[in-house]
């Protein structure tokens, strides 16, 4: 079973379309949050996620948008009510059972972190291995990661919609996970 993984789209529909093309045929697709920007909604991105059957969780940007501070942006007349409602009811985390493996989807960390950025070289990264899942898929840092913490495989697809300059590259990325083989790959691209 192949799972296509995107995260941190931040309203970038062309990047999502490119990622879908590059991931190729997959059995399922997941979005690990931040499909929108804190105070900006994207009908196009949310429609693509919904209409292409992405299993989607919320990130910190959705939490801001659907929180008290997002009341005014949510009232914009151009936002499609059905898309707004679809995104609003998506969970903040989710565990999938695929091919006998537990796959945990989170945006930031499996533990309550207040949106903390935990990168692969951080001391806290080892805490990912404390979960009972076989695989943790997470986003938030905008940095692609394939690593292990204990027996747990950790995959971060990086940012599919908004690259950050940490290593001098402005590449967007997504990932594909072969669940049976526990074999992930990162796909880097530019528009």
Region spans (language model):
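Active-site-proximal beta-strand elements of phosphoester/diester hydrolases
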Residues: 2-10, 102-109, 153-158
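Active-site-proximal segments of metal-dependent phosphoesterases and phosphodiesterases across multiple
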Residues: 70-76, 99-132, 162-165
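Short acidic-hydrophobic surface loop/beta-edge motif
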Residues: 92-100, 145-150
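Conserved hydrophobic/aromatic beta-strand scaffold that supports enzyme active sites
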Residues: 93-95, 105, 174-176, 186
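Short, solvent-exposed aromatic-acidic interface loops
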Residues: 185-191
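Core catalytic region of metal-dependent phosphoesterases/phosphodiesterases
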Residues: 2-92, 96-97
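Active-site environment of divalent metal-dependent phosphoester hydrolases
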Residues: 10-15, 37-40, 62-67, 111-113, ...
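Conserved beta-sheet core of the metallophosphoesterase superfamily
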Residues: 119-185
